[in-house]
Amino acid sequence: MLDVNFFDELRIGLATADDIRQWSHGEVKKPETINYRTLKPEKDGLFCEKIFGPTRDWECYCGKYKRVRFKGIICERCGVEVTRAKVRRERMGHIELAAPVTHIWYFKGVPSRLGYLLDLAPKDLEKVIYFAAYMITFVDEERRTRDLPSLEAHVSVERQQIEQRRDSDLEARAKKLETDLAELEAEGAKADVRRKVREGAEREMKQLRDRAQREIDRLDEVWNRFKNLKVQDLEGDELLYRELRDRFGTYFDGSMGAAALQKRLESFDLDEEAERLREIIRTGKGQKKTRALKRLKVVSAFLQTSNSPKGMVLDCVPVIPPDLRPMVQLDGGRFATSDLNDLYRRVINRNNRLKRLLDLGAPEIIVNNEKRMLQEAVDALFDNGRRGRPVTGPGNRPLKSLSDMLKGKQGRFRQNLLGKRVDYSARSVIVVGPQLKLHQCGLPKAMALELFKPFVMKRLVDLNHAQNIKSAKRMVERGRTVVYDVLEEVIAEHPVLLNRAPTLHRLGIQAFEPQLVEGKAIQIHPLVCTAFNADFDGDQMAVHLPLSAEAQAEARILMLSSNNILKPADGRPVTMPTQDMVLGLFFLTTDSEGRSPKGEGRAFGSSAEAIMAFDAGDLTLQAKIDIRFPVGTIPPRGFEPPAREEGEPEWQQGDTFTLKTTLGRALFNELLPEDYPFVDYEVGKKQLSEIVNDLAERYPKVIVAATLDNLKAAGFFWATRSGVTVAISDIVVPDAKKEIVKGYEGQDEKVQKQYERGLITKEERTQELIAIWTKATNEVAEAMNDNFPKTNPVSMMVNSGARGNMMQMRQIAGMRGLVSNAKNETIPRPIKASFREGLSVLEYFISTHGARKGLADTALRTADSGYLTRRLVDVSQDVIIREEDCGTERGLKLPIATRDADGTLRKAEDVETSVYARMLAEDVVIDGKVIAPANVDLGDVLIDALVAHGVEEVKTRSILTCESQVGTCAMCYGRSLATGKLVDIGEAVGIIAAQSIGEPGTQLTMRTFHTGGVAGDDITQGLPRVVELFEARTPKGVAPISEASGRVRIEETEKTKKIVVTPDDGSDETAFPISKRARLLVGEGDHVEVGQKLTVGATNPHDVLRILGQRAVQVHLVGEVQKVYNSQGVSIHDKHIEIIIRQMLRRVTIIESGDAELLPGELVERTKFETENRRVVQEGGHPASGRPQLMGITKASLATESWLSAASFQETTRVLTDAAINAKSDSLIGLKENVIIGKLIPAGTGLSRYRNIRVEPTEEAKAAMYSAVGYDDIDYSPFGTGSGQAVPLEDYDYGPYNQ
């Protein structure tokens, strides 16, 4: 068996009949499957043991040889080889067909590859294949030309004979008529009778003439057909063809069905055809040229590969191994079988019947019918339903063919190769574990025992608690007490992976150190819930166990939750205290403000002294007091040092100081690192996130993790002691509400009257009412706000950011206000009641309308968002960091600061998502002094420093300007947002980009909504807009952009309206037809620049690329995608969007091929285009010219170089057909390809540069060790394999929060 890790490419091609016979272990001759009495496979049938191998290990069919000692022997009685039964998953058979059949993929696919090769329309091809027309396969041109005069003479003689026969027959009939008439006259017959006789005679004579004419016409038709007969002509008229064959059968050959195509393909000259097509491309135009290009693609595919076109017509059909199409017995004695067996049986039955008919010498019409049925049976086996009605099984269900086994979500690629189920896994409900440290999880004992069973058993044997593995297993099953002691020892520092579906980004799987817990639920640390998007309302999570030392090391170093504090989408912390914790810390840091609590104004010598007073009940947490802080404490930012007295030294950073603060804040600061500036303000959710952000940016991960744990513990501790609860009495409806509502009701009536009088339109009335009631709602909300004391629990929850917002509070205590209907239009009738007062029936009904739409929307959004993520992953999966630095000097100029109206510099709003975490492309120099050198990471600290120096824009490295041949380089990517350090080589940044864009997809709205004033002015927003951008579709209601700079003229007629631009350079005017309702951005006589938008709306990215070039379309797409995410408050870094856009623009359309081996109109990878042109220029030829092509992500995924990746994405059969014809080779660069064939993925530690590394100490390391300790006891041989042990994080002990 091939070792999967030691080959570089995987090629697919067309299998010829010889290949199929070579793979086969024998011919399947009978349609039988198994004997229903003995339940053993039938000989020569579809499950035959002689062909496919034994059904039992080391046992032949007849039972003569049993046991492994006869390995390899072929039984002389039954012919079965003695071997393992698993060969029945590998061995193939074949069916020898009595007549050739075409492969449906190549004739019925779009475009039809067979049709393109032979230059036949698919309709005509179908006629030949299904025996509705004859095809001429050979014409003896030379002999025909030589014999033409004599044949023509022969035909003219025959024509004369027909005419002579006609004339003599007519003459005889005329004489008979004369005789008859004479006789009648003699008898004295009436004129009437004579007339009838004459008419009858004339009728017969006409028939004679017509028959003769038909014969002559037929003869002429046959002769003309023969004269102009060419190879590949079709003849659908059976009688005409027979006559042709009878008369001139020695000059040509013709036949029906796949046999005709087979003969044609054998004599087909590929080189000659290619030359002819190239000539047409050089000289032809329009449709003819386009068709020639498409045909040349197919012809050159066969020329440039070892494929033979004969492979498209099959003489034998492979039979896949029986264990891949199993037959199993059900309880009632019946059998369930794979559909493939039924399809194979149909093929074998028809094939055997055809053989019998051929042996009997049956008439041609019967044989042809049987051949057609065989063709249809093979079609159904390969791709059921592709042509005609599908073959159905019981209950009219279409049978699953070989193609269906590969296609779609349930197909082989996505079900079994990309999504396998794994062992050493478990699943259970999750509950919160507030006592856990950030890197721990609680694992139920029963689950841990089952997962770690092999480890426990081995350890029991090692410790002599059990004699052997068997007895150890018995001990585990009986649950002896010693087993749990050993389990405790085994799981220590052995990380497990926890995964919550749906895994939308990399933080959906994290590693934790397990702690044994009672019960059956997994315990989760509260801070990782955000990353998993988990809550405890019945969510379940899966546990996976990393087994090898390498897997454990990766889990601990890369995946441990305390190492995954940052979110890969924007590089900001994701493990943020929420809900109760925020409430507790907010309670801790609020001050008395206006109240005089116990202990207010006292002074204390230290925090400990103040705590003592608090414990004694003499002081509250919120009382403002003076506390003296010890040496080393950093005062708050903006701290003013105390005025010094005469002779005293000046106060310096680190000295003791006294501060007016609260005990709560002093306790809060003890949770933070010692050298963190003192926090002397109320800490709500927003302030807390700023603090955690700051910590993540400035401190090592270990300190951040410990601080987060401290914040969690203190948050829960003080939330419990704060006594914050929710009661109905906490919700107070403002007294002023009635008055306010009454006032606005008057205004409402006034508007209503104006409408009834016809003074305002319906649209205006709606807008006025919405404005009135929005104002009313806001006024009630303000009154409600003033009504809530600061200490009100509901108010505290909202103000701290723990839960809820002002809008929800307004609906509970103020008034519900205006709601929207299912079309997302605001209903102008407000809901005047609040939930506290209770809604009337009508009000309740109105409010349910929009709410139901919201729920339906969410369900749809989830599916659409998941599909978007899948397409994004597919298009970007091979973008991996491949090198340190590509050496480019290019970059993007990005703004980092903007000037206010008064001229002061402020940090630009989008710095967080654009400049942050990139590398500088060049030195930042001010007055000849380098402030920041090139290739340095732009973190928060450096950006602040640059803004302070007055720098407004910087040139940064970017993925879009990276020049790496494969993947991208670390310097152009910059900082890895998930780790906060420069990205490592091997990081799969493409997939991270796709996850970062796809994960918040569910939060985006689905709406295409109507903007209030303008009817029909639809704006696509939310998820559909993101999809539209990434699929590079022309937007709905596209806004034209000017193709040249010039003057604007607006022309308007009764029905149409257009903007005409007269270019400055005097070239032709350009007219842009627009709708009468479009809102203009330019006026009559304005001057526009090239690429300027002329109306309101979205621009077409293809136009931007064509008119303004590649850089402009990149900026446009990044900006538009960010606009959608920003509108929902989602933060995603530009670099993720840039990766996707780079993949969309990585292909070039060839315009002129020059001397390069490229076809005009062909789409090629940019790198291939540049490499080929370089080669041509070096050889002194003309390079090819091309233009950049913007492709949508679906199209870009299917156009990838890797056929494995494309086939597993969409349109599986089309991709495989194409790949097989082109004999494509997959160089296994991306991730999907390697997952499919079971190789290590070429990312992270799977990169070849990281495998088989020997670690040796450097000279410096040795010297340092020598100086540190006695060198006799150190072994400097190369390090061996790791033990899999790791350093516990508990080395950093911060103790309880309040010591």
UniProtKB/Swiss-Prot annotation:
Domain of life (superkingdom): Bacteria
InterPro entries documented for this protein: DNA-dir_RpoC_beta_prime, DNA-dir_RpoC_beta_prime_bact, RNA_pol_asu, RNA_pol_N, RNA_pol_Rpb1_1, RNA_pol_Rpb1_3, RNA_pol_Rpb1_3_sf, RNA_pol_Rpb1_4
Residues annotated for Zn(2+) 1 binding in this entry: C60, C62, C75, C78
Keywords recorded for this protein, A-Z: DNA-directed RNA polymerase, Magnesium, Metal-binding, Nucleotidyltransferase, Transcription, Transferase, Zinc
Binding site for Zn(2+) 2: C886, C962, C969, C972
GO MF terms held by the record: DNA binding; DNA-directed RNA polymerase activity; magnesium ion binding; zinc ion binding
UniProt subunit comment: The RNAP catalytic core consists of 2 alpha, 1 beta, 1 beta' and 1 omega subunit. When a sigma factor is associated with the core the holoenzyme is formed, which can initiate transcription.
Protein name per UniProt: DNA-directed RNA polymerase subunit beta'
Gene: rpoC
